[in-house]
Amino acid sequence: MKWTDDDNFMRGAVPMTKAEVRILTVAALELVPGQRFLDIGAGTGSISVAAAASGCTVDACECHPEALGLIVENAKAFDVSIDILAGKAPDVLSETAYDRIFIGGSKGRLDDILGYCHGHLTSGGIVCGNFVTPANAVRFREFLKARGYLWTFRYIAVSREDRFGMLRAENGVFMVKGQKP
């Protein structure tokens, strides 16, 4: 089963990083087997599954009860191991150091999460966040700039053909990436 295909994931009512954005996110994270990976606001676990399938040791943080169940189901379906941290970040996060961190949701606690990420990301490590609001994307970029990270800021817009042959736009996503000095 491929993690690049949305139809392979259990979703329910939980938002999921769509295939095109997931592929670009995984590329931006530059995953290497053996790395420690943290997924904050893991949702359905689609990014966690991709990281685990790439050979990373994965911790997925999520507070929504339905999403927690979907992460378990998706990990099982893809035959990967994901350690689940149930609750809000950064409250339930450990003192573990991570090589790669993905922020998929912040529940209004972006500043606290960014502080945690900065303190627990290894030197040379990559943190990447996908945001639907420009305000959070800009806050993340400014955080990275102020701390000397190498950073990129992108807006990703995807359209898909519908059954009538017309292109229908998906919601756009701001992708911000930083590499710690």
Regions flagged by a language model, labelled:
Residues 116-174:
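C-terminal substrate-binding/active-site "lid" region of AdoMet-derived donor-dependent transferases
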